[in-house]
C-alpha cells in the first residue's frame, strides 16, 4: 500500500503504540514489518488470528512472556560448531519454558471450556515442538551465571579439590597473619590478592623474616606483597585445577551446544511461534485499550463503520460517528464548518481501513463491514497536523495527478477540500470534473468541500451521497457529529440572531437570497433531524438483531449438547447390557462344562444333545436381554400411573406419570421425563426416601496458574497459599501468580513474608504492570 498515504494517516503512530506493548525483540520486529495486506484470504486470516488472542486476553490471565528473546544467532553458531555460553543456553532454556507454560495454559483452557474454538492458535500449539530433553539437559547443568558443580562427576571433583585447597591456603595464611610475633612485621593483618595469588602485606624492613615470592609492592616501596613459600605449591595446584576446570567446563558446554544444534530446526520453530504470539498479544493489548472489534470482510464493495472514532484522539472527548457507503454509493461529499471534524472523518476512515487490513481490531461498535482495498490514496492538506504545514494549490494538484494515474476500481480516495486554493468558480468546476473522472474509474471516494455547488452535485449524479458535520447554533460550536445523507447548510442567519443582530437586518438578508434557497435550508434542517433519528434507530435494531442471533446460537448449542448427552446415555446402556449378556454367556458355558465333567465322572445318563438344548435355552434367554429395548419374556404385574418402576434400558428408577394407549408410559427419571414402551419397565416396590448424600467430585484437571486471595482473611490466605503451592509443585509449574490486590498492602506483605519461608519457593517478585503490578506476586517454584 502507498507509503505516502500511510504517513498521512499516521499509521506509524499506531505501530509505535503496539510496539510498546511487546515483550521481546521478536515481537518488536514483527510490529516494524507490519503492513496492510491486500489479499482477501490473508487479511481475513490476520484478523481472525488477532481476534482469537484478543478473546483469550480479555477473559484469562495469559502466561508471562518475560525473558523471551531471539535465539537465531545462537542456533546459527551452534550449527557451525561454536560453543554457547551459560547465559546463551539459559536464553534457549527460557524460550522452551515459555512455550511449555503457554501450551499448558492452552490445554487447561480447552479443559475448562470444551466448546471454545481457536483453530489458528490450536494449529500453532500443535506445531510447537517437544523440547523436554533439551530443556532438562540445560536446566540440570546450567545455573543462572555458571555451570552447577554437579554438572559432571569430573567438574564436581575438580571444584571440590579447588575448594579444599583454598581452605588449606586460607588456614595457612590466617595462621601467619594472626601470629602475635608477626603483628609488627605486617603493614596490615589481612590477606589480599596480587596477580591472582594470595599474598600478605609485609613491611619492607622485615622482608628477610618471610620466605616467599614478592608479587608487588606499594607505591612508596614500604610494603611488599609476599606469597609465603608454604602456600606456593598449593597455589600452583589451584592454577592447575582451574585449568582443568576450564577444560571440563568447555567440554560440558560443547556437549550442550551439540544438543542445541541437533534441535536447531525445532528451536527456530519455537522462536517463530512464540515471537508471533508476543506480536499478537501486543495487538490484543492495544485493541483492548481502544475497545477494538472485529469487522466482517466482504467481497462486495462495502463500508459500514458504526460509531467509529479516531484511535489517536483523546478517548474521553472524541466523538464517534457512523461512516457508511450505502448500497450503490461510490462517492460521499462532506460539507460543513471549518474545524467541524471533516478532515478527522477522512483520516478516521482511511486509518481504520489500514488497521483492519493489517490485522488490528478497529475502534467501532460490533457489526462493522469492510471490503478489501488495493490502495488508499490521500490528498489531505493536514493543516490540523503538527508534522505538515498548509499545502498550496500546486502541491495539491500534483498529488491529485499522481492519484488519478494510479487509482483502480478497488481503491479508496480521500480528498480534503477538493479544488480549494484557487478561484471558487474554477475550483468548484475542477472538483466536479475530478469526481466525474474518478467515478468512471470506479474508485470509492470521500471528499470534503466548502463549495455550495458540490451540494447539488449529488442530486445530478448516480452513486453520490451528501454528508455534513453538525453545528450547534445554541453554543455556536461544531458538535463533530457526522450526518450521512444530509448536505451542510448555512448557519449564518441563526448565528447572527444568537449573537443579537437586529431582526430587521436578518429578515432583509433572507429576502435577498430568495425563497427557494430559504426552503432548501429548511429542508436540510429537517433532514438533519430525521437522519439523527434514523441513525439511532438503526444502531438499536442492529443491537437487537445481534442479541437475537446470540440467543439463537446459544439455544442451538444447548439442543446439540442435549442430543449428544441422550445419545451417550443410550450407548452406555447398550454397553452395560452387552456386558451383562457376555457375563451370562460365560457363566452358562462354565455350568455346561461342569455338567459334562460330572456326567463323565458319575456316568450319568445325560445325552450331549440334551446339554446342547439346555445351552440353547440359556442363549435364547440372554439374547432377549441384549435387545435394544431389553424386552422381557416374563409377564409383569400391570403397571399404572403413580407406580415406581425400573427402566431396564438405563438401569434407573422412575415414576410413571401417565399411560399412553396401553403400550407406552411417560416416566419421570430425576429431572428427565421420557416416553418409554411398557415392556421396558419393571414394577418395583416403593421405597422410603433417604436423605440425599452429597457426592464430592474430585477435580482431576490441572490447577490454574493463579491463586486469587482477594477477600480472604490472613489465616485463610496462608492456608490457601500452602495448599496451592503444593498443587503447583505436583503440576510441575515453574512460575505461578498470587493475586492479593493492592488495598492497604497488609495481605501482600503477609503473603511475601510467608513465601520467604516456604520450602517450595525459589524466589518471588512484584508483578510487572502487564501482569497486575503490585496487586500480584509472581512466584518461581523450585
UniProtKB/Swiss-Prot annotation:
Protein name per UniProt: Endonuclease MutS2
Top EC category: hydrolase
Entry keyword set: ATP-binding, DNA-binding, Endonuclease, Hydrolase, Nuclease, Nucleotide-binding, RNA-binding, rRNA-binding
Lineage top rank: taxon: Bacteria
NCBIfam families named among the record's database cross-references: mutS2 (TIGR01069)
Protein family (similarity comment): Belongs to the DNA mismatch repair MutS family. MutS2 subfamily.
Assembly and interaction partners: Homodimer. Binds to stalled ribosomes, contacting rRNA.
Function per UniProt: Endonuclease that is involved in the suppression of homologous recombination and thus may have a key role in the control of bacterial genetic diversity.
EC number: 3.1.-.-, 3.6.4.-
Domain Smr: 707-782
Biological source species: Staphylococcus saprophyticus subsp. saprophyticus (strain ATCC 15305 / DSM 20229 / NCIMB 8711 / NCTC 7292 / S-41)
Record's signal peptide: none
UniProt xrefs under Pfam families: MSSS, MutS_V, Smr
Alphabetical list of Gene3D superfamilies matching this protein: 3.30.1370.110, P-loop containing nucleotide triphosphate hydrolases
Binding positions (ATP): 336-343
Family matches, as HAMAP family: MutS2
GO biological process terms held by the UniProt record: mismatch repair; negative regulation of DNA recombination; rescue of stalled ribosome
SMART domains to which the protein is assigned, alphabetical: MUTSac, MUTSd, SMR
Gene Ontology MF term list: ATP binding; ATP hydrolysis activity; ATP-dependent DNA damage sensor activity; endonuclease activity; mismatched DNA binding; ribosomal large subunit binding; rRNA binding
